[in-house]
Structures are given as structure tokens and as C-alpha cells.
Amino acid sequence: MPISVDKAVIARLKTHGETFEILVDPYLARDFKEGKDVPIEEILATPYVFKDAHKGDKASEHEMEKIFGTSDPYEVAKIILRKGEVQLTAEQRRQMLEDKKRYIATVIHRHAVDPRTGYPHPVDRILRAMEEAGVHIDIFKDAEAQVPQVIKAIRPILPLKLEVKVIAVKIPGDYVGRAYGEVRKFGNIKREEWGSDGSWMFVIEIPGGVEEEFYEKLNALTKGEAITKLLERKGL
């Protein structure tokens, strides 16, 4: 269900000496600008393109055709979102920025370790390092695409090593049903085989920072009966 007009914000594009505006859901508009597959119909509060949204002054089909090469308001809206700016409130911008920072810090926590200890840095410590380094985060850019630049910026403050771990696991047959789907969420199964007793044996590659979480999940799923062996640590 589209956002109501009173909760929508304006997305604005100035081009060819003209201004074009649409009313959008700020969070879905952000997702769209990040490259996520969000139907334009769900983003728009109303299926119109305006010259001035506050006055309700709509753009004519002739104007849209002349400048955008189409009079379809949905196609024009996509162009406005891609090339224009979303007019967020200060609180919306602050919340989106905090959410994106924490997401980026969580990605780093999962994929990087402290080379001195082999363990991941806590998310809050990574966030503090980002603050100390004065890292710029773009709220309209995909979070994972910003991770490399963030790692580069905080490395002088926080030693980091990108790493994956390769682990051999054997799960008794009694627990395979409940463990199978959960285990696959952690990483990439490199190879697997089944024992005559129904046990599941596999080698999995996981992000370096989730090793302890992986072991804890295995123990919970198998009541401590899973057998594991760390085969390899691979730097990225």
C-alpha cells in the first residue's frame, strides 16, 4: 500500500531549466536509489509528476515528453529518483545515516578480524573508529559497496584483516533436519557427503568474524554433538 501524501517527502530534479517533483516514501526511495528492485508504484504517494508539489501544480504530458522522452509518469518518476535529490527531514536523514553506519559496521564485524587476536572487533568499537576517522557515509549508496573505503579509512585506528575460515563439520543424523537450513545461512558449502548412519559431513567457508557464532549455533542445534575442525584461514 503506497505511503499517504501527508507522510511522503519530495524528490526533486532540476533539469533543462525546469523543476520536476514527485511525492515519495523516503525509505523506499532510498532503497531504489541504492539499486534495489522496488516497484515505482510502491514508492510514489500519488502517480503524478509535479512542477511544484506544494501547490499541486502538475507537469504536462508535453513537458515530460519534451524533456524526458516519455509522458509516462512512472518512467519519469524513475528518472527523477535516479538523478534527483530526495528532500528528507533532519530526523529521517539522521536515522537513515545511523542505520547505514551500523549496517556497515556489522558487515565489517562479520568479515574482518583483529590480526592480533584472530577475533572480530565489536560493532560499537568499529562505529567509534568510523567516527574517529571522519568516514563519510552516503545514505543513498549501497552499504556493502561502501565497506572497502570504510575499512581503508579505519585501518590506521583499528587493525583489521579480511578473512574467511574453512571448517569441516560432522552433524549426527538425529539433528540434520533442524540444522541443514540454518547452517547454510552462514556461508558457502564447499563439499558434502552423507554417512551410512545418516550423519551429514561437509566443509563450509564462512566469514572470519562469525566463527564463534557458527560454533554456538551448531552446539545449540545438535546439543553439543557436532564435531568441527578448522581447516584453513584465508586472507582476502
From Swiss-Prot:
GO-annotated biological processes: cytosolic ribosome assembly
Pfam families associated with the record: SBDS_C, SBDS_domain_II, SBDS_N
Highest taxon of source: Archaea
Family designation: Belongs to the SDO1/SBDS family.
Subunit structure: Crystallized in association with 70S ribosomes.
Protein name: Ribosome maturation protein SDO1 homolog
Taxonomic lineage: Archaea, Methanobacteriati, Methanobacteriota, Thermococci, Thermococcales
